[in-house]
Amino acid sequence: MLKQQLYDANHDTDLKLERVKAKELCHQYNQLSPADEQGQQKILYQLLGKMGANCCITAPFWCDYGYNIELGENFYSNHNLVILDCGKVTFGDNVFVAPDCGFHTAGHPIDYERRNQGLEYAYPITVGDNVWIGAGVQVMPGVNIGSNVVIGGGSVVVKDIPSNSVAVGNPCKVIRPITEDDKKTYWDR
């Protein structure tokens, strides 16, 4: 999977067992009381590859393997986060993810014969520091999102987004840079 080559996720016994283990941990996590922060942290430490301090994932949360996910410091996600981590998914520090977002490293061949064999590929996703991902955003395989970025709600991110930018749309495109004026609050303008 991590070699960015075609692999068989449907018939590989080890991968199937690893996905079941991750789904079990996600299920346990999603059943916890929202007040059980200690229980949440315990499961996330079992599930994720790396987790910085002050991380919060609001249930429900689902992933494929978990061990390919790395969270930086002060990561926060709202409800319904899905991370298909067949490839590495790395989040920097101070990343906020709004509800109903997905990070999808897995893809399938366009050629139906290979696709029907159960073959798929995975490309890593990287999100830099100080990033806000709006509600309903979907990030596709191989995307790199720079630091100090805002991705507008409902966007489908299919190409890299440079640092210090606001990007939105389907497909997601940079609409403007982030400037010093953005440090002013809306009521100061």
Q: What kind of region is each of these model predictions?
A:
Residues 132, 150, 166-168:
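Short-chain dehydrogenase/reductase
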Residues 1-54, 172-189:
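Terminal amphipathic alpha-helical/low-complexity segments used for targeting or macromolecular assembly
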Residues 61-71, 76-145, 170-189:
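Flexible, glycine/small-residue-enriched loop-and-beta-strand segment within the central core
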